[in-house]
């Protein structure tokens, strides 16, 4: 096994990096550049809990405008529920949005990444919100973990459900279970 095949398999299996079929035809320096570019990124490890019907999004494989797959945290407002395929994927999802996120923000030499380089600046979606008793449609930019971290290396791990204490409204803060 060549080093390039070993690194390719590691990148795909352990780091969830999409590697196009064309990679096998790349010249040596093209392979090095490609792998370095894909692997030299900040890392986020996201602790996810089992989905027990709470509203919200979760961890999904997403295809971007370049037809590249990546692991992303997707909010429910980003999902087209009129699309049966997307609706079924959400209904069959096993896990919920991250409870904990641990990040590595330095490169291999200890230098901080320019995190702005790894954000999806062109990402947006429309959402319906309530405003003064009326339903309005707004243009929304994704938040920190699903927009600003869109091009990070991502791993999802399962964590115990008791680490999950969602706050969807101020009344959720009154729930005594979160103060144990």
What are these regions (language model features)?
Residues 3-180:
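OB-fold and OB-like single-stranded nucleic-acid-recognition modules
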């Amino acid at each position: 096994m060549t080093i390039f095949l070993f690194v390719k398999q590691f990148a795909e299996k352990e780091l969830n990096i999409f590697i196009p079929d064309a990679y096998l035809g790349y010249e040596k320096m093209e392979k090095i550049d490609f792998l370095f570019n894909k692997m030299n990124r900040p890392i986020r490890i996201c602790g996810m809990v089992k989905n027990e019907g709470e509203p919200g999004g979760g961890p999904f494989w997403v295809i971007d405008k370049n037809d590249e797959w990546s692991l992303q945290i997707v909010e429910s407002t980003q999902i087209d529920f009129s699309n049966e395929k997307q609706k079924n994927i959400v209904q069959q999802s096993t896990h919920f949005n991250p409870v904990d996120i641990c990040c590595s923000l330095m490169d291999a030499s200890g230098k901080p990444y320019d995190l702005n380089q790894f954000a999806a600046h062109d990402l947006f979606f429309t959402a319906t919100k309530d405003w003064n008793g009326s339903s309005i449609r707004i243009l929304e930019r994704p938040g920190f973990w699903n927009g600003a971290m869109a091009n990070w290396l991502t791993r999802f791990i399962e964590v115990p459900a008791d680490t999950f204490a969602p706050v969807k409204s101020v009344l959720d803060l009154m729930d005594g279970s979160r103060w144990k």
